[in-house]
């Protein structure tokens, strides 16, 4: 397995060695992270897609992207394995070292293994039920599980799939979204604290550097929604568990020119003052990665997005997201080489200044 993790020196070397505009890196937790990342969500669980994802990750890294995002349930574990192969080949070829890239994955959804031809429930019973990793009642109706025994097992599987000794960031995946139909909010928060305790332990063991929450609804909806979470409360929980140097430093949420709640919705509170989730994250020192930049292609249709900056739709979408104050990087799902090339043209131009971005938002919302 590949040892190491992203470091300030390694990521700075990556930034210096890349041919992209130097403004296209954000400094967070002393790491230099590209302001576009590659995501690996979609695709068939077959060998052709394995090759496409592996090559897309390699092409992205060689084009100046050092943020790579995946999840154990993406393509039933094959996404993680494709990422792992890409990283191994890049390191073997001397193109990068482990300390130059930031790799995140997600655990929480129960998944099978696409490389094993077996019925889903048979696999779950054999791999998780019989060994006692999960017991009756642990898995919700949404095929989600956040017991510490399950998440500990899944982290080890993710590390094995990725061929990494240490993961830079492990997200708890859609936790309240996957749990709230079956457990009370109070019970959920108790369980979340146990997960944070587990992840602090895994930091001590050297298996992860940071942990976070990859979400869909909870940080975008209003506080009367059962899925709503106040980021200030979650950070306070992390401090209670891990002290001031706790590892809860990142969230992920959907954000684009259609899903604009992260920017415009004042659903969060900081010292009782209404703020957006992006404003809250900045104040609390939480890094934000964003998903679905193109709404899985729907935003790229002619006439869907407003015109600005004379950029093609895909670049316009990325420019808007990565220029938003508080966003570290949109995560772009891309497999075909021509899509990678087109999307990463954005790395040749700097993000918008805060002033220009705020003027654009004013224009678009007036």
Residue ranges and their predicted role:
Residues 2-24, 149, 156, 173-366:
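Beta/alpha (TIM)-barrel catalytic core signal, keyed to glycine-rich beta->alpha loops juxtaposed to Asp/Glu
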Residues 113-171, 177:
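Active-site gating/metal-coordination segments in enzymes
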Residues 52-56, 154-157, 317:
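Well-ordered alpha-helical segments embedded in enzymatic catalytic cores
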